[in-house]
UniProtKB/Swiss-Prot annotation:
Recorded name of the encoding gene: hemL1
Protein name: Glutamate-1-semialdehyde 2,1-aminomutase 1
Transmembrane regions listed in the UniProt entry: none
Reaction catalysed by this enzyme: (S)-4-amino-5-oxopentanoate = 5-aminolevulinate
The protein's annotated pathway: Porphyrin-containing compound metabolism; protoporphyrin-IX biosynthesis; 5-aminolevulinate from L-glutamyl-tRNA(Glu): step 2/2
Cofactor(s) this protein requires: pyridoxal 5'-phosphate
Listed SUPFAM superfamilies: PLP-dependent transferases
Stored Pfam families: Aminotran_3
Organism: Staphylococcus aureus (strain NCTC 8325 / PS 47)
Chain segments annotated as coiled-coil in the UniProt record: none
Cellular localisation: Cytoplasm
Length: 428
């Protein structure tokens, strides 16, 4: 494939934006390849400005659960645009999406719309601290909860991709109130609560850690979080920005049968437009302004375009949607294991609903330390060869791949064949 136009565009972009991008992973640094500039997408396919076609497993980093340019979403967006893009006042569309979210997410009795997942987690932590009167938050190594200061500590995903353990610019005074323990390690969490329990406002966790390459919870982990937080009077917060409506019809909390106090949402809830949300029990949510004294606001929160895209996306998801994802996931997982075994290359495949992660090591992978043992050099080679075969994968070992309703069995079979061809060139 040729990337002449992308390379020229990147040279210009680097004079205009730091690193030439508006989000670090788009620079493709960890796979040592030129950044690809995209032009358009349709269904399960995405097309770059050089005219190359790819089967897309990035899906805008998760939001496009229906694939690119879903006809129903696009049609209703056109109708919404004709009425106006933003009003700075409430619309009926906010009620529609809020009711749908409340109906689908077990923990949510009231919800507040925002414009990004980072806003959702930031505001949720403020709410947890204000509601409990406590200062400290517990998070898990390798779990990414957006780029607010108190959460950008041992954060996995983008930070891990860049090889940075933490981000400079996070003040010590903020960092000291964030306690970090290994993911899937209840014993470590118990020790943290024994030491700081009276000042822990909440525990925030990705119920499936999608920002270390898709790492599901081990048996009993989420229920253990529920039990420990209840014992100490702390809030359990599920960051379902990635897992929300991807792991199951009732999100990860419905799939695993564990209900948190507060939930953060994003990505799929916006159907490709900038949306975040957080919600939970009425008694907690009613502490937010204007009912309570915990402040939160946003100029474009609940804007009609985002509400339209979100509602028209979620309204098309049914329990049968997730059966389809499981079927495609089974085919892809079996194919990956077969092809990698054929070439004597170790692989560990982790799955949760329409999220799939593969690690180039013997496994198992249940935490960030084990995820870090993946062969990153081989991953970069694999990425480059797969792009040549017309498969667009996340350019980072620490990001998961995503399925959409637009993907077909044919797409999956082509992808498996592409892995076989790529490995044939890499493994001599």
């Amino acid at each position: 494939m040729r990337y002449t136009k992308s390379e020229e565009a990147m040279k210009v972009a680097e004079t205009l934006m730091p690193g030439g991008v508006n989000s670090p992973v788009r620079a493709f640094k960890s796979v040592d390849t030129p950044a690809i500039f995209m032009d358009h997408g349709k269904g399960s396919k995405i097309y770059d400005i050089d005219g190359n076609e790819y089967i897309d497993y990035v899906l805008s980093w998760g939001p496009l659960i229906l694939g690119h340019r879903d006809p129903q979403v696009i049609s209703h967006l056109h109708e919404a645009i004709d009425k106006g893009t933003s009003f700075g006042a409430s619309t009926l569309l906010e009620n529609k999406l809020a009711q749908l979210v409340i109906d689908r997410v077990p923990s949510i009795e009231k919800v507040r719309m925002v414009s990004s997942g980072t806003e959702a987690t930031l505001d949720t932590l403020r709410l947890a601290r204000g509601y409990t009167g406590r200062n400290k938050i517990v998070k898990f190594e390798g779990c990414y909860h957006g780029h607010s200061d108190s959460l950008l500590i041992k954060a996995g995903s983008g930070v891990a991709t860049l090889g940075l353990p933490d981000s400079p610019g996070v003040p010590e005074g903020i960092a000291k109130n964030t306690i970090t323990v290994p993911y899937n390690d209840l014993d470590a969490l118990k020790i943290a609560f024994e030491k700081f329990g009276n000042d822990i406002a909440g525990v925030i966790v990705e119920p499936v850690a999608g920002n270390m390459g898709v790492v599901p919870p081990i048996e009993g982990f989420l229920q253990g979080l529920r039990d420990i937080t209840t014992e100490y009077g702390a809030l359990l917060i599920f960051d379902e920005v990635m897992t929300g409506f991807r792991v199951g019809y009732h999100c990860a909390q419905g799939y695993f049968g564990v209900t948190p106090d507060l939930t953060c949402l994003g990505k799929v809830i916006g159907g490709g437009l900038p949306v975040g949300a957080f919600g939970g029990k009425k008694e907690i949510m009613d502490h937010i302004a204007p009912l309570g004294n915990i402040y939160q606001a946003g100029t474009l929160s609940g804007n009609p375009l985002a509400m339209t895209s979100g509602y028209e996306t979620l309204s098309q998801l049914t329990p049968e949607t997730y059966e389809y994802f499981n079927m495609l996931g089974d085919i892809l997982e079996d194919g990956l294991k077969r092809v990698f075994a054929k070439h004597n290359v170790p692989i560990t495949v982790n799955r949760a609903g329409s999220m799939i992660g593969y690690f180039l090591n013997e496994g198992p992978v249940t935490n960030f330390e084990q995820a870090n043992k993946s062969d990153l050099k081989l991953f970069a080679e694999m990425y480059r060869e797969m792009a040549k075969e017309g498969v667009f994968l996340p350019p980072s070992q620490f990001e998961g791949t995503f399925l959409s309703t637009a993907h077909t069995k044919e797409d999956i079979e082509k992808t498996i064949q592409a892995f076989d061809t790529a490995l044939s060139r890499i493994v001599k």
